[in-house]
Amino acid sequence: MSVGDKSVVFLIGAGCSFEADIPMSSSMIEKIETKIEKESDWANFRELYFYVKHTIEYGSKLGGILQDFNIESLLVTLHHLSEHRQSILYPFISGYSNDLIEYAGRNFNNIRELIKKVEEELPRWITKSDYKAAEYYTGFDRFQNEYNYPIRIFSLNYDLCIEKQINSNRLETGFADGKPWDGTRFTHSCDDEPDAPIYLYKLHGSIDWERNKNILICSQQQGIKPEIIFGTGTKVQAVDPYLFYLYEFRKYALLSKIIVIIGYSFNDHHINDLLRQALEVDDLRKLLIVNPYELNNVYGRVGVLSTDERIIFKSVGAKEFLSSTLTVDYLSKILPDEEMPF
């Protein structure tokens, strides 16, 4: 078969940056709870926070929903509560529980204040003064040189591990020369020579993105309000680059022969739906799941039977996988001979 630049697609989640000392979502929850218990300016949110947390957990168990409580489920719930009057369901709701009304404060102001405090902390937790621990991300660069075709990395992370470890002239992010984000930088005709061999699509935003009057720029300044989104309900926004990136992920997932998934917990229903669709339309497409920990019901979340041999697990961390395991030969051995793109 012909060899192109679309046979391998990468999808990375928080676990990919864990060994670079970037806290995962569950660790951020621990940080919030420590602040609530130990810092006076957080203490007033204690009852509200734990009420929301326990209600989310109870609702998940009651509905049989496989959803971990994490920073995203917390924030998407708080955002929905803060905007409850804009919901189409608002006229049907006779009232909220007395506990929620008490903890949320007048006009739900406490909810908005808690959102503000959490979102102010998030960039501090993710930003590193030194990205040396993320050196293993250069494995993407090494693989691309061996593969000899452009690669596409779809990231669910807000951190800058890739940007700090891969030379900017080899990495396409949609930004250049201080100009606003431009989606056309990701699209080239068959006759065009791509400007960079590695394309990075940050599906949930980035801590160095800033939006001003609907203009998205990449900022080097400290203390900006980063353009990041949370939770399934808010991730599908009718605004670029989010819609464009989701379209691109669907497009290249459907064109790929193997989707390499590193450190993703399968908690995003929209992403899971796109993975499910990719499996449904091609009986030979593979999912290679790189994670050192056992994941809860991956098969069910992507809509396949537990006997489906297209789902392949590699029980190592991202550091080991990117540093030594990921090679053209390794991926070639996973694919059937007639489907090898190399």
Predicted regions and their residues:
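Phosphate/oxyanion-binding active-site loops and adjacent basic polyanion-contact surfaces
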Residues: 20-28, 41, 114, 125-136, ...
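Short, flexible loop/turn elements at secondary-structure junctions
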Residues: 15-16, 158-160, 204-207, 266
